[in-house]
Structure formats: C-alpha cells, structure tokens
Amino acid sequence: MSHAHPENWPVLIIAGALDTELLRDVKTLAAAAGESDGNPPFSEQTLVTLRGADAGDHSVLSFVLYAPDEDSDPATAEDLAGVAVVVENGDESGVLELAVHPSYRNQGVAGRLLDALQGKRGLGGLSAWSHGNHEAAAELATRFGYGPVRELWKMRLMSSTSALPDAGLPDGVSLRAFVPGQDEQAWLTANSAAFSHHPEQGSMTRADLEARKAEDWFDPEGFLLAVNAEGELLGFHWTKVHPRQGPHPAIGEVYVVGVTPEAQGLGLGKALTVAGIKHLQDQGLHAVMLYVDADNEAAVALYQKLGFVRWDTDVMYGPLTKN
C-alpha cells in the first residue's frame, strides 16, 4: 500500500462504459465497501449503466483513483482507492455516487475525487447519494456546500415477526409468474402507467429490463404478475434476493410493486405485497427489506402495518446554493 498523499495521486477520468478489467476492480471495491458498511455504495442502476453505456458517452463519467504502489504494476483491485461515478439525467442534472476502499479511508481520497470532478464537470445540477447516511459523507457534503434533500428509508421485516395479514386478490384477478420472452412489453407498458409520477422507475426501457434479467439474482418465479380473466396485466410484484455478503446473511427485497391506474383502489397493491413477501419467506430467508421515500406517508403506514420497521436510511444531498 502506498504511503503517498492522495492529493498527488493521478485521477483517471473515463467517459462511458468501463472496460472489463476496470469494471471488475470497481465491483471488487464496491463489495469491500459494502461488506464494511452494510450497504452497497452504488445503486443497481449505476452499475447497469457502467456496463451498458457506449464508449466515450459523456453522460456517464467515472473518476478513478488508484493508489500508486511500486510493488504493483499494473494496478490491481487492491490498489483501487476510490471511484466516483456521475450519471447525467439529460436535463443538466445528474446523480453522483462515490466509494472509497476501507483500506484507504480517512486519507482524503473522497475529497481528491470530488476536486477532480469539480475541475472536470463542476458540481452544478448534481445530487449525491449516501447509502447508509455515513457521518463522513455528511461532513464531505457540508464541505462542498451540500445538504440533505431526500431521505429513502430502508425498512425490514424479520421472518420471526408475527404472521402476515390475509390479503385476498380482487375478484377475477389471479397471480402467475413472469414468462421471459412473452411478458416484457406488457410489463413495460404496465410499469410506465403505474409509475407515471415516478421518473426513475417509470422510465425503464427494454434495455434496462434486459440488463436486470441478465443479473444472477433474476428469478422469474419471484416476478409475480396480477392478471384479469382476459390475461391483461393489472399489477406486479418483482422480488429480489440479495446473496450473503461477508457477515451479512442473504435477504429478500420487495424490489418493486406496481398497480396500473385502472386497477388502483381495489386492494391489489396490498395483496401483491403480501404475496411477494410470502414467496420470499418460503425460501427460508431471515428477513425481507424494501426502500420507501420517507415522505410517502401512505406507503410507510402500509408497510408498518405489515410489520416492517425502519432499519437504515439513504440520504440524497443537493447543493444548498447554486454551484
């Protein structure tokens, strides 16, 4: 490990997709950070974008800081000190996520990355996620004139919690599993309608869906579709299982639940939520988690009634003044 100061280390700036070796190194760093913190430093969408973007695509910028080490040439994952990734939204705004390897923390690595970002792109229009709301992230945000603008709660239901309530499906509605090669377009249409108010989820494309289907965690049996007697898709509950990571056991996730506008108000959302949770619990998982915006009082109340409790918080930081 190098004992030089990070302010003297070169920052690599890459536009677009990362090459195979660098993406591997970033995943290794992310796994080490996640094991140390109990939270993954990058969102799933960010990793999907890093794999799928075109080379040279400036809507995705990665700032990579390798610690120079005379005993390591070329650089390896063990020498990757930190990474910052900016994904532009196309409207002069973007989202920043940053990770520092546990072995290189408290040495100024994050500040070095942000200085490079500020020099290359500037911070204008950028918001930044802190997954787990770490104290160091809050201090760094303050240094750069940022403050909290959004809270995303992580809620958890332990399998030892009392039984889930009964939540029957509306008359004429049945559940079945997603069928790859058949249901993609119907799901994209239903998802867009269900989340017309939610730009992140509602704007999912076929490429986004295919990228998730290619992930190791994808299981069509855990992708539940609610259909009417004519086979029309009215709602869905897509579940996910996160594998064990170091000391952290595997855990299920209420990945996304959606109901089309014409089927809302029938109790279908609750029925889908309960059905998906039961599917996850039947796999022997110790707990099920989900993400929900802290200010979505109706959703928080529903999940609390099902036995979920607040477990952790992701905080989005935004500029307090125009950069």
Curated annotation (Swiss-Prot):
Instruction: Write down the chemical reaction(s) this protein catalyses.
Output: 1D-myo-inositol 2-(L-cysteinylamino)-2-deoxy-alpha-D-glucopyranoside + acetyl-CoA = mycothiol + CoA + H(+)
What is one process in the GO biological process aspect for this record? mycothiol biosynthetic process
Q: Which residues form the N-acetyltransferase domain?
A: 21-176, 173-323
User: Pfam families in the record, alphabetically?
Assistant: Acetyltransf_1, Acetyltransf_7
Q: Recorded E.C. number(s)?
A: 2.3.1.189
Where does the chain bind 1D-myo-inositol 2-(L-cysteinylamino)-2-deoxy-alpha-D-glucopyranoside? Answer: E44, E200, K240, E253, Y291
Which InterPro entries does the entry mention? Answer: Acyl_CoA_acyltransferase, GNAT_dom, MshD_Acetyltransferase, Mycothiol_AcTrfase
Q: What class of enzyme is it?
A: transferase
State where acetyl-CoA 1 binds: L98, A99, V100
Protein role = Catalyzes the transfer of acetyl from acetyl-CoA to desacetylmycothiol (Cys-GlcN-Ins) to form mycothiol.
What HAMAP family does the annotation carry?
A: MshD
Describe the family membership recorded for this protein in Swiss-Prot or TrEMBL: Belongs to the acetyltransferase family. MshD subfamily.
How does this protein assemble?
Answer: Monomer.
What protein am I looking at?
A: Mycothiol acetyltransferase
Organism field: Paenarthrobacter aurescens (strain TC1)
